[in-house]
């Protein structure tokens, strides 16, 4: 089989390594897990869902994807707005998305509030009750693109920096997202807070264990996946991140391939033909090397039509590399000079509001930073924001008020003469459910996880709501 046939063949696969069969459905601009401030359907029958004593009133469909549907809903008692993602549950498998979501607690990751099962026509569905976030980076970027304006640099920096934090956090837990794209980056435009969503393709990668290569949305798919690698690492998320950064700067996808082979062609047009050594680094089992010799296109030329900061071009050149091991790590990306403006205490949003929380690093994040990077990543004015006890700064002590409550998003710290060294059990806690800083939303403290024995009832009301 030729190299072209090998790549095209992967576009025909219909199952993922969850064992789920992929189906083709109409996908909204916000994808299966993103949210919208307004439901997309003009008419929607309100449905009342009761689970574990909590009553949800669905308001409308806000997203459709290959694995399910997302509806906007209201918690009847509290009037809190949530998003409910409903996916078909294959009873032969545990739902990996639910198990992974239970592990996560980070300000830049959409939070899981509850989960329950429903049945319909002899099929079982898993319902994930998620934090509601009104917009996506995709829609914001498209708004600027349609207005023929670039996304302001301050927003590009904020979005990518927060995305790096979320990726660094999940990677510290061994989790690979495997579907980083603008549609999966939820955004609260009032605060510019970004939250990574849709962990339907996510997986804990184990060295020596094979994984499917047909994963990740095409325009953001790392070249090792196109070359059929089944032993890839979390660096595929870093490639996707670089593609998102380039897209925000260009106003369009950097590699707009129409199929597997065309995607590789688009990458080669920019990076040049990969060498045998680079192909071996991507997939040591790939044997066909029949590619036309094309020289790399210098990055400044790729962005020549745009007013793009030199630091951003330098950053992209260190991310979008064929050799996965040569790409910057997410935490190294955060420390890049491109983001120095965010570390300036005088920097604020264009409307004068303060920046969203950027330095409240969880213990899990800190274990991946290291003392050298910490000096760059955590400015002196933000030392009171990191989670304690800090493996980076053991001399920082938790005040008595914060010891009694772990719900504060910013730890109140003070200098202490008595050194508090982080114990091995503390620094290794990232391998289990992390003790991290919760999202600022008051509703976060109500987060619960239901069991498979949930009693759930569903009622469809006769009232039709117009949106």
Curated annotation (Swiss-Prot):
Q: Mutating residue 85 to M leads to what result?
A: Inactive kinase
Give the domain of life.
Answer: Eukaryota
What SMART domains would the database entry show?
A: S_TKc (SM00220)
Q: Which PROSITE patterns match?
A: PROTEIN_KINASE_ATP, PROTEIN_KINASE_DOM, PROTEIN_KINASE_ST
- Where are the active-site residues found? 179 (proton acceptor)
Role description: During cellular differentiation, may mediate an extracellular cyclic AMP stimulated signal transduction pathway that regulates prespore and prestalk B-cell proportions through inhibition of stalk cell formation and induction of prespore cell differentiation. The cAMP receptor carC appears to activate gskA via the tyrosine kinases zakA and zak2, to stimulate prespore differentiation, while carD appears to negatively regulate gskA, to promote prestalk formation.
Name of the protein: Glycogen synthase kinase-3
**Name of the gene encoding the protein in the UniProt record:** gskA
């Amino acid at each position: 089989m030729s190299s072209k046939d090998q790549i095209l063949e992967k576009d025909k696969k219909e199952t993922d390594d969850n064992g789920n069969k992929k189906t083709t459905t109409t996908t909204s601009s916000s994808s299966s897990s993103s949210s919208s401030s307004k439901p997309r359907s003009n008419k929607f029958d309100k449905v009342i869902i009761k689970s574990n004593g909590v009553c949800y009133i669905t308001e409308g469909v806000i997203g459709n994807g290959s694995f399910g549907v997302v509806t906007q809903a209201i918690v009847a008692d509290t009037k809190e707005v949530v998003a409910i993602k409903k996916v078909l549950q294959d009873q032969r498998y545990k739902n990996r998305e639910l198990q992974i979501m239970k592990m996560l607690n980070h300000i830049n990751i959409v939070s899981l509030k509850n989960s329950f099962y429903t049945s319909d026509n002899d099929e079982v569905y898993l319902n994930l009750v998620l934090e509601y976030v009104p917009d996506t980076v995709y829609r914001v970027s498209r708004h600027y693109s349609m207005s023929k304006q670039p996304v302001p640099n301050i927003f590009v920096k904020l979005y990518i920096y927060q995305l790096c934090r979320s990726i660094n956090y999940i990677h510290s837990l061994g989790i690979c997202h495997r579907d980083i794209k603008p549609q999966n980056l939820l955004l609260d435009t009032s605060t510019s807070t970004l939250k990574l969503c849709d962990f339907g393709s996510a997986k804990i990668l184990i060295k020596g264990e094979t994984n499917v290569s047909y994963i990740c949305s095409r325009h953001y798919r790392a070249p090792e996946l196109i070359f059929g690698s089944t032993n890839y690492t979390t660096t595929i998320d870093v490639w996707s991140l670089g593609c998102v950064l380039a897209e925000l700067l260009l106003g369009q996808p950097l590699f707009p391939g129409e199929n597997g082979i065309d995607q590789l062609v688009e990458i080669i047009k920019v990076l040049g033909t990969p060498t045998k050594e680079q192909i071996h680094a991507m997939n040591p089992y790939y044997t066909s090397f029949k590619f036309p010799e094309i020289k790399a296109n210098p990055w400044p030329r790729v962005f020549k039509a745009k007013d793009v900061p030199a630091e951003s071009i330098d950053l992209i050149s260190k991310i979008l590399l064929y050799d996965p091991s040569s790409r910057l790590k997410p935490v190294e990306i955060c420390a890049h000079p491109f983001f120095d403006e965010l570390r300036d205490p005088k920097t604020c949003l264009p409307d004068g509001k303060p920046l969203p929380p950027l330095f409240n690093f969880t213990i899990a994040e800190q274990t991946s930073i290291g003392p050298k990077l910490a000096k760059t990543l955590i400015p002196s004015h933000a030392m009171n924001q990191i989670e304690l006890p800090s493996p980076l700064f053991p001399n920082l002590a938790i005040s008595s008020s914060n010891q009694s409550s772990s719900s504060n998003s910013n730890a109140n710290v003070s200098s202490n003469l008595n050194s508090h060294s982080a114990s091995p059990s503390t620094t290794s806690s990232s391998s289990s459910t992390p003790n991290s800083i919760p999202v600022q939303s008051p509703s976060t403290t109500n987060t619960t996880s239901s069991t498979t024995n949930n009693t759930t009832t569903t009622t469809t009301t006769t009232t039709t709501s117009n949106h």
